Amino acid sequence: MKKKVYYWSPFLSPIATCKAVINSAFSIEKFGNNHESYILNFFNEFSLFRNEIKKKNIKIINFYKFNFFRHLPYEGKIRSRISFIILFIFGIFPLFKKLKTNKPEYLIIHLISSLPLILLILFKFETKFILRISGFPKLNFFRKILWKKALKNIHYVTCPTENTLNYIKQSKLVDESKLRLLYDPIITFKEVIEKKKELVNFENYYLSAGRLTKQKNFLFLCKAVKEIIKKDSNKKFLIAGNGEEKGKILKFIKNNKLENNILLIGYVDNIFSYLNKAKGFILTSLWEDPGFVLIEAGICRTPVLSSDAWPGPIEIIKDKYNGYIYKSNDIKDFLKNFNIFDDKREKNQIILNH
């Protein structure tokens, strides 16, 4: 009988972690001879990826018949916090019951990690808990207390970058023997080739992508674009994603008459077709771990301009070799590097190094 591996990763809006979960589960299905993977579809959030999950023969465990996902707000800090509380209340007992009844070999925790970690503190399980660091962890007071207690009973903690691994080591919140470096899984080149073929209804643009949050720093990009178009009003920038700062970004675009230069295109299921056609990819994040879209841009051989965000981008991008790096949140340095980045001859050299 195969050992069961459960994935816990509830989300309010699609992010790169969702695809990482699917790819990880698929890897277990494909290469784990004695294991089978299950994604816990807590409130119907993974129905967005139903076709891909079915195609990859990954099993789904549904918690509720009612589609919570359609009704939970995710835009705005207060509303997203309310949604988190709702998820916590409706999730803690069903997850406890699933683990006690089904007794999977492993529970891999990606998002909303506090819920299963609290269960790990309060109860004993036959299941081995694995915490996957998804995004750079801000060790605030609550998280430090929670991790200090919960990680005593954790099986492993996996980190997507060496910088994060060292950061967790230095925190001394978990025994070093339980730490592992594990890079995020990516789809096969065959799949990328197929996805790149899809048509995109835009031409001659730069692309940015991610949740519209403070972390992604898209307002900074909008301010930079305002300066860029003073020299060339035909420049076009697409931002793919949804999130709590959408209203602020739209307001800035409207107030500065940037509607013809900056387009918010919402969440994009297939980012590869957009990356393939883009003049370049721009990452303005304040921090990333690892910065999954940088890897996707590299696969598409799309030139990259990235902030020197820690821990992922600074580890992935080597300045003027496989991309360009600017000082995070520094408009002058961004504009200087964008001018070089915008030079076709410079970009051709970067493409050769991907």
Model-identified regions with their sequence ranges:
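Short His-centered aromatic/hydrophobic patch
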Residues: 88-91, 109-115, 133
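A short, active-site helix/loop in glycosyltransferases that binds the activated sugar's phosphate group
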Residues: 154-179
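A conserved mid-protein helix/loop that constitutes part of the nucleotide-sugar donor-binding site
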Residues: 18-26, 204-230, 244-250, 292
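N-terminal strand-loop element at the rim of the active site
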Residues: 7-15, 27-83
